[in-house]
Every structure is written in structure tokens, then in C-alpha cells.
């Protein structure tokens, strides 16, 4: 029941083509491909900018001293 044979998928494909038509399916495929490409480009750009930030942060040092400011309040 959970697995479908190739004939089930071919019947579903024929029904989808009849309902939507090949032109509309082609446009959906192009839009989906463009979205995937845009996502990959965005991921690549964010990785590159992340490396730039790491290089900028890695060269700077900050000298600081921590102090304890815990106060006990008695009521």
C-alpha cells in the first residue's frame, strides 16, 4: 500500500499533464530551478561574507578586565 509501481506514477504524470498542460508545467520547472539557483547563490555569498567577518575579527584583540559586582541585599 505504501509503495507505488511505475505504472501508478505514469498515470499520475499523465493526469497532471492533462490538467495543467505542458506549458504551465515548463514554467513551474523554470521557476523552481531559478529559486534553487538563487538559494545556492545566496548560501555561497553568506559563506563568503562569514569568512570576511572572521578575518576581520581574528586580527583585533581587546584588553579587558572583569570585575565582580555581586551585591547581597538583606531585608
Swiss-Prot record:
InterPro entries: TatA/B/E, TatA/E. It is found in: Cell inner membrane. Signal peptide: none annotated. One of its GO terms (molecular function) is protein transmembrane transporter activity. The chain crosses the membrane at residues 1-21. Residues 43-75 are annotated as: Disordered. The Tat system comprises two distinct complexes: a TatABC complex, containing multiple copies of TatA, TatB and TatC subunits, and a separate TatA complex, containing only TatA subunits. Substrates initially bind to the TatABC complex, which probably triggers association of the separate TatA complex to form the active translocon. This is Sec-independent protein translocase protein TatA. It comes from Aromatoleum aromaticum (strain DSM 19018 / LMG 30748 / EbN1).
